[in-house]
Amino acid sequence: MTAAPDARTTAVMSAPLAEVDPDIAELLAKELGRQRDTLEMIASENFAPRAVLQAQGSVLTNKYAEGLPGRRYYGGCEHVDVVENLARDRAKALFGAEFANVQPHSGAQANAAVLHALMSPGERLLGLDLANGGHLTHGMRLNFSGKLYENGFYGVDPATHLIDMDAVRATALEFRPKVIIAGWSAYPRVLDFAAFRSIADEVGAKLLVDMAHFAGLVAAGLHPSPVPHADVVSTTVHKTLGGGRSGLIVGKQQYAKAINSAVFPGQQGGPLMHVIAGKAVALKIAATPEFADRQRRTLSGARIIADRLMAPDVAKAGVSVVSGGTDVHLVLVDLRDSPLDGQAAEDLLHEVGITVNRNAVPNDPRPPMVTSGLRIGTPALATRGFGDTEFTEVADIIATALATGSSVDVSALKDRATRLARAFPLYDGLEEWSLVGR
């Protein structure tokens, strides 16, 4: 006779979050309210679809699966093998790549694995200077990339704020790096991947492109693809790609074995199979016409904001746009001639219901926790459904706040921002999905 289940165990396994941990449930509900009622304009953030949230909150959370499909160190992987193969196949198809590894937990982990595969400690790495828009993992001295490797940097022209490929070539010829990274965290222009490839070939370097910020634009065919030019390409899945927070790697087949080994066991243990399921869903969505339309609105919105922030009334207040515009999903705002610094401007926009992040501008005189700039992005609002009309309104709210400064009517601007947010409901019915504990 089968014993009755232990009531204590079954109660915990079936009880909702609000009952098990009301503190966390309340905080999730508050965060949902914040996301719904404010305008999210941090360039590295987006909203994952319901299907991705469901995949990432699924029973795959329970499964350990060290290794690769068909070559696991654990039993019971027959279903997660199919999940991972789907994710890999979709990544290869979406970006036209020869191989894909979908196990990196983040973009930083992806970069760490690629560098581990392509370089040895002490060898030379050339990347975009953090102060000019580069990423921590491109050689910043406190990051693993700055500690394990000898680092050189290229930057932007001090007048145009554009990357000068002749200057990159000169730096590479002098520094002779083992790997060149082309990519950025805060640079509003398209990179010349063919020129980077030519320079890498000339100095005998491997080329890694970090497309974490613009991968969604590449997937939609609205941004040049780095895949034909790079040896390896890394990305996150949660920025313009609009999936869950995670990373992936694509590239040439000749590097697959080294990179697979660098991810596991080199950098990570077991992959997060629930997250990989979410990646598979996001990659499927990224191949749809709806996704391409969203990316078009993302680009258009960024250009609308850049144009408004270059208008005479804003320029008169000492506000300018780095490089004079944007080719991508973000606008980098220069406040060096404004009464506002980056921290003050971020706080002001937060008060009116718009979330952005302060960001260094090229050759910024202020410390990193203050900065002289803002980074403003459009992916999350495009995901909500914003088009040119709504982005024009958002641009005017931002322009009014930055041009007026401390004397701005915060209440009036917040009313405008809140009306816009509520006109495009976010996660309608999420409470009923049992994903916020209510």
From Swiss-Prot:
UniProt cofactor(s): pyridoxal 5'-phosphate
Localization terms from the record: Cytoplasm
Family: Belongs to the SHMT family.
Pathway the protein contributes to: One-carbon metabolism; tetrahydrofolate interconversion; Amino-acid biosynthesis; glycine biosynthesis; glycine from L-serine: step 1/1
Gene Ontology BP annotations: glycine biosynthetic process from serine; tetrahydrofolate interconversion
Its biological purpose: Catalyzes the reversible interconversion of serine and glycine with tetrahydrofolate (THF) serving as the one-carbon carrier. This reaction serves as the major source of one-carbon groups required for the biosynthesis of purines, thymidylate, methionine, and other important biomolecules. Also exhibits THF-independent aldolase activity toward beta-hydroxyamino acids, producing glycine and aldehydes, via a retro-aldol mechanism.
Residues annotated as site: Plays an important role in substrate specificity: 238
Binding site for (6S)-5,6,7,8-tetrahydrofolate: 130, 134-136
A cellular-component GO term for this protein: cytosol
Catalysed reactions, semicolon-separated: (6R)-5,10-methylene-5,6,7,8-tetrahydrofolate + glycine + H2O = (6S)-5,6,7,8-tetrahydrofolate + L-serine
Alphabetic keyword roster: Amino-acid biosynthesis, Cytoplasm, One-carbon metabolism, Pyridoxal phosphate, Transferase
Residues annotated with N6-(pyridoxal phosphate)lysine modification: 239
EC number per UniProt: 2.1.2.1
Origin: domain of life: Bacteria
NCBIfam families associated with the record: PRK00011.1
Principal cellular location given in the protein's record: cytoplasm
Assembly notes: Homodimer.
MF (Gene Ontology): glycine hydroxymethyltransferase activity; pyridoxal phosphate binding
Pfam family, one: SHMT
PROSITE patterns named in the record: SHMT
Protein name (record): Serine hydroxymethyltransferase 1
Enzyme class: transferase
